[in-house]
């Protein structure tokens, strides 16, 4: 509970917080803060933020859920994470927000160091390859 509230308070200046107040163990942002004219910031979406987190060694959080929010980014930190790790996550999230404002292509082309970039997720869901031999 403490970790989630700490992260939320540290990041609410860069990410839209649709529900104010104390959270239990998770909270949801609704995309990056912008001028209110668009659902994304300079073309950077929640998916872009999640993919960019991979470049910094952080597991991407749950995205686009709950469906109540168009650019939902659900943050669920474990209470066993050290303050150093939580602060590093906060720093990375601020860096990603700054990148979205300066050059959104950095986010749109992420992840940069992964062996697989951005697979066609719709095709993968419709035609899953369940055996390694089928992938060859």
State where each predicted segment sits.
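Non-catalytic terminal extensions of PLP-dependent enzymes
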Residues: 3-136
